[in-house]
């Protein structure tokens, strides 16, 4: 699935940026079963998150952000799988607007892999993989959030 390119101007709007984040996360999740058939499951749990409304600015308009967007699947993966998912994550998000990709190796010896991709504006997607062991419930999850932006209708009123 190829995601339509959006201009930076479009992504300054809450609706466009929100849809782009959903599409990017969904695209990555849907692409994983190609290499990992184990992840082709109907048991993925999805949470569309919630919209938080900021205090009104000096113009009387309120920005909105979206938090808690997530996909989660309880599944047992191996170290090699986590390494391969990291490579896919890096490739997928390097070509998106969330091009600042990094890996946090701090807890990998405990079987916990964490990858994140963020935009220069501050939007972010995290991928967490917990391998089976005495401290972890084996799973893979993606979570994302969108920083505060104006809705399109508010921006139109601001420009009048």
PLM features: what roles do these ranges have?
Residues 42-56, 101-125, 129:
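Ser/Thr-rich, low-complexity intrinsically disordered terminal regions
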Residues 53-55, 64-66, 152-154:
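Sequence contexts marking disulfide-bonded cysteines in secreted/extracellular proteins
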Residues 60-112:
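Long, charged/polar, surface-exposed segments that mediate recognition or autoinhibition
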Residues 1-61:
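N-terminal leader/targeting segments
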Residues 116-160:
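Non-cytosolic coordination micro-motifs
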Residues 44-47, 51, 92-93, 148-160:
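A broadly tuned "polar low-complexity/structure-edge" signature
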């Amino acid at each position: 699935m190829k995601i339509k390119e959006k201009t930076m101007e479009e992504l300054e709007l809450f609706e466009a940026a929100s849809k782009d984040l959903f599409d990017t996360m969904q695209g990555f999740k849907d692409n994983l079963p190609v290499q990992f058939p184990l992840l082709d499951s109907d048991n993925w749990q999805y949470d569309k998150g919630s919209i938080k409304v900021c205090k009104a600015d000096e113009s009387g308009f309120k920005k909105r952000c979206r938090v808690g967007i997530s996909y989660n699947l309880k599944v047992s993966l191996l170290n090699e799988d986590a390494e391969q998912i990291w490579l896919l994550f890096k490739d997928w998000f390097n070509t998106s607007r969330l091009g600042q990709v990094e890996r946090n190796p701090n807890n990998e010896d405990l079987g916990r892999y964490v990858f994140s991709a963020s935009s220069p504006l501050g939007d972010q997607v995290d991928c967490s993989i917990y391998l089976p062991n005495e401290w972890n419930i084996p799973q893979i999850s993606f979570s994302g959030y969108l920083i505060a932006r104006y809705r399109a209708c508010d921006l139109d009123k601001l420009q009048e």
